[in-house]
C-alpha cells in the first residue's frame, strides 16, 4: 500500500510540476493508464443539428465500462456496457447487443470511454496550460483521421490533481459534443 501511495505522489508531482517544470503529457498518460477503476458523473451536451443534454454516471472496472443515463428523466435508467468493438444496451432487465459507431468515442454512450482512453494511451498533438473555470488546467489536443473525417478532442485536466474537468469533441472543426465532469473518483 505504501508503494502505491508513493507511486501516486510521484506521478502527480510529474503531472503537476512540483519542481516548477512544465507539465509532461507522458505523466498524465501514466496516471490514467495506472487507474484500476474510475467513476465519473458528467453532463454531456450533443449538438448534431439538434441540441440534446444528458446526465450520465460512468464506471470503469476490470470487466469493462458501464454508462447509466441519469437525465433526462425519459431516458433515466438506460445502461450501456461498453467493451472493445461492441456494446450492450440494457433497460428494465432486457439487453440488446449493438455495434458502436465507426468513429468511437464520439457518441454520448462512449464519450467518457474515448476521453479516458486518449488520456491513457494517446499522444497529444498539442498540450498547454490555461485556466478553466477558476482551475489551473492542462489542455491536451488529440487528433485522428477517421473515415475521411478529422476527429479532434480537447481535454482539460486539473493541473494539480489530474482530475478531468471538460472535453470538447470536434468533427471537421465543428464542435459536436461537450462533456463537463461533475464528479471524478479514482
What are these language model-derived features?
Residues 44, 71-73, 82-84, 93, ...:
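A mature extracytoplasmic/lumenal domain signature
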Amino acid at each position: 500500500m505504501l508503494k502505491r501511495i508513493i507511486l501516486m505522489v510521484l506521478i502527480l508531482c510529474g503531472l503537476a510540476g512540483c519542481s516548477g517544470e512544465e507539465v509532461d503529457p507522458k505523466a498524465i498518460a501514466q496516471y490514467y493508464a495506472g487507474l484500476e477503476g474510475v467513476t465519473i458523473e458528467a453532463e454531456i451536451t450533443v449538438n448534431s443539428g439538434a441540441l440534446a443534454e444528458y446526465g450520465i454516471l460512468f464506471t470503469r472496472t476490470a470487466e469493462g465500462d458501464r454508462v447509466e443515463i441519469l437525465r433526462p428523466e425519459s431516458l433515466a435508467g438506460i445502461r450501456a456496457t461498453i467493451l472493445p468493438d461492441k456494446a450492450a444496451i440494457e433497460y428494465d432487465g432486457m439487453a440488446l447487443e449493438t455495434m458502436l459507431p465507426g468513429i468511437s468515442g464520439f457518441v454520448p454512450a462512449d464519450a467518457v470511454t474515448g476521453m479516458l482512453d486518449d488520456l491513457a494511451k494517446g499522444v497529444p498533438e498539442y498540450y498547454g496550460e490555461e485556466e478553466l473555470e477558476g482551475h489551473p488546467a492542462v489542455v491536451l489536443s488529440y487528433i485522428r483521421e477517421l473515415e475521411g473525417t478529422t476527429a479532434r478532442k480537447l481535454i482539460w485536466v486539473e493541473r494539480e490533481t489530474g482530475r478531468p474537468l471538460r472535453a470538447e469533441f470536434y468533427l471537421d472543426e465543428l464542435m459536436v459534443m461537450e462533456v463537463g465532469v461533475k464528479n471524478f473518483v479514482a
